[in-house]
Amino acid sequence: MGMPDRESLGGPVACEPPFVAELRRLGVEVAEETYVYGGKLSRTPLRQRVVRVLATARRFSRLLREAEFDILHLNSSFDTMALLRDAATIQLLRPTRARIFVKFHGSDAALFETNRAELRSLVRFVLARVDGIGLLSAEERENFRRAGVEGQKLFVVKNVVSAGADEKSALQVQQSANLLRAKLGVDAEETPLLLFIARFIPAKGLTDVLDACAILRDEGRAFRLLCLGDGAARAAAEAQAARLQLAEQVRFFGYVPEAETGEFYTGSTILVFPTYHYEGFPMVIFKSVAAGLPIITTRIRAAADYLREPDHCLWVEPRNPQMLAEKITQLLDQTEARAAMRRHNLELARQFTARVVAPEYLEIYNQLAKT
């Protein structure tokens, strides 16, 4: 299995290790190889990228020669850089008896409509040479189907989401919130904590969140916004917060390791995540589901497949700070609605445990192995 580097950022590093652990518990022999192209926060030189891809392909080839593996599972993304890596890897591996299954952690549908002939050829090459494609939402499956990909190759799959606050009582959740407030120096117990956690790129919607916070502040609403993450848009976001005079309301934490984010999910009041990125299964949303955290987000891909308003979330339009501010106000003013969201989200989270998700993949693997 091609795995993310354990030091990398994003969803795969959170969901794939517990998935592999469950496969092994079920008796499946799994060999892991790091399968990355470059870094998230810093640019990796082209030469280093090429060397890394070639070395990874050689390791895969050796493993497939030395043992009779049935499936090669690659964790990837349907974007230009990842497809370049995938094409090189697949070409260097052929021929192989193992069936190749690629799980796309997000997909850029614009690649199907590109005018660049070399990109169209790259897309056709990869999609023609894999045996199965894992997509994280029904929308993505429909995009691939409309682009002419054979339906029998397409599978809608889930990410594993580690258990959150399902065994915590309401009192324990309040205690978590109080501990987080104490750590942050927020004295007032009634001050709500809004959470934004993501890689800082414009499409994640942080600009809209900050504009919405300025509206809330001007309306006299007390709150704190906790911004966890790093990336290319961080400097612009910090400058925007300063320009809007939000120093008292907004705190930037920078990158927080996955293992240290739990207290923010369980201690915050609402996740505010108006993303319009092409991610398939936003782990921030589903980690919030697992923590029983009320959610305000956009109706995007896997979120649209599994979440329902008002049971699990409130929907907001992308690039609409006024609407976002109104939804935040609505949810903050409805204590019972937040409590109901917590219950419903904890129930929904059971669908994404490793013990539920791993057997679903085994069915796909068995189907591919028989073809």
Task: Give the ranges of each region predicted by the language model.
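Short alpha-helical donor nucleotide-sugar binding micro-motif in glycosyltransferases
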Residues: 255-256, 263-268, 361
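Short hydrophobic beta-strand element within catalytic cores of glycosyltransferases
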Residues: 285, 294-297
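Donor nucleotide-sugar binding/catalytic pocket of nucleotide-sugar-dependent glycosyltransferases
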Residues: 122-179
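Nucleotide-activated donor-binding/catalytic signature segment of Leloir-type glycosyltransferases, i.e.
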Residues: 238-256
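Acidic donor-binding loop of glycosyltransferase active sites
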Residues: 266-280, 293
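A short, well-ordered alpha-helix in the C-terminal region of glycosyltransferases
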Residues: 182, 323, 330, 337-351, ...
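Conserved donor-binding/catalytic core segment of Leloir-type glycosyltransferases
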Residues: 161, 176-204, 210-213, 226
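Conserved acidic donor-binding segment of nucleotide-sugar-dependent glycosyltransferases
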Residues: 309-321, 330-336
